[in-house]
Amino acid sequence: MTASTVALALFVASILGHCWVTANSTGVASSTERSSPSTAGLSARPSPGPTSVTTPGFYDVACSADSFSPSLSSFSSVWALINALLVVVATFFYLVYLCFFKFVDEVVHA
């Protein structure tokens, strides 16, 4: 098994793992899990419309995107670290086995 095959296998495993985590962590309820409220015993009166609609202004909305800090308490951050480690290890093996040994062979044969 060559180093490029190992690197490709690690890459595919990383992608499949990410897709599995993304598919299982959507948190969206399916249509079978939703329940409709029961209307038994309620009169059919129309509900009053909204009295006033207030839209938030530009400065009323808070955003904390610039204060992101990684946390090791979530599964996704641990999974991202594992993926990064796999990429670093695969890159190391790729460089050592393909580039370095080709360089040594060229120097020895020249």
UniProtKB/Swiss-Prot annotation:
Biological role stated in the UniProt entry: Envelope glycoprotein necessary for proper maturation of gM and modulation of its membrane fusion activity. Also plays a critical role in virion morphogenesis.
Membrane-spanning residues: 81-101
Membrane topology summary: Single-pass type I membrane protein
InterPro entries documented for this protein: Herpes_glycoprotein_N_domain, HSV_GN
Range of residues in the leader sequence: 1-17
Compositionally biased tracts (Polar residues): 28-41
Subunit structure: Interacts (via N-terminus) with gM (via N-terminus). The gM-gN heterodimer forms the gCII complex.
UniProt lineage: Viruses, Duplodnaviria, Heunggongvirae, Peploviricota, Herviviricetes
Compartment(s): Virion membrane; Host membrane; Host Golgi apparatus, Host trans-Golgi network
Protein name (database record): Envelope glycoprotein N
Highest taxon of source: Viruses
UniProt similarity note: Belongs to the herpesviridae glycoprotein N family.
PTM entry text: O-glycosylated. Contains alpha 2,6-sialic acid residues. N-glycosylated.
Positions on the Intravirion side per record topology: 102-110
Gene Ontology cellular component annotations, sorted alphabetically: host cell Golgi apparatus; host cell membrane; membrane; viral envelope; virion membrane
Region named Disordered: 28-51
Topological domains annotated Virion surface: 18-80
Record's keyword terms, sorted: Disulfide bond, Host Golgi apparatus, Host membrane, Membrane, Signal, Transmembrane, Transmembrane helix, Viral envelope protein, Virion
